[in-house]
Amino acid sequence: MKMNKLFFGLLLQAAFYSGSLYAQADLRTDAYSIIQDAVTDIVCSSSTDAIQKEKRVIQVLNEKGKEDASFVCLCDRFSSLKKFSGEVRDASGNVIRKIKKSELKITEYSDGLVSDDYYYFFEYTPSRYPVTITYEWEIKNSDGLIGYPSFVPQKSYNQSVAQASYRIPV
């Protein structure tokens, strides 16, 4: 019985490994952008307070993927953007631009009647493709952590995901 479990585990590992290699080679097919890395870490300091650390590395392959180069962060009376940094690199890996928190725009537009929600956003339109954009930010949740944020690394159609992780240390 133990040998069957070991064999089954090795078989699953081999299938997963070969499948992931195939997927890596196939990421550009029909893709306008690729999420090279999406990391979400939730660090809870109490039952009502937490820090949400986010990192996104997005490679925009062509003009059809330019919407994926933008940054958007929703905040409300329970959550606020504490840290932000961004960086844009060209195809050779040279830094084209660094983005600071002070460059983000804020809008309080809401489709509802009354809302405390507001958005931080940054719109970037590349002049040449491909470009790789890295965004790193921290959101402080306080006075009411009802649940953990959802994890959806793929934000648009025709977008591939190379690597993504969601961690909640205990």
Where do the PLM segments sit?
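Beta-strand-rich, non-transmembrane domain signature
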Residues: 23-170
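Positively charged n-region of N-terminal signal peptides that target proteins for export
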Residues: 1-6
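Bacterial N-terminal signal peptides
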Residues: 9-20
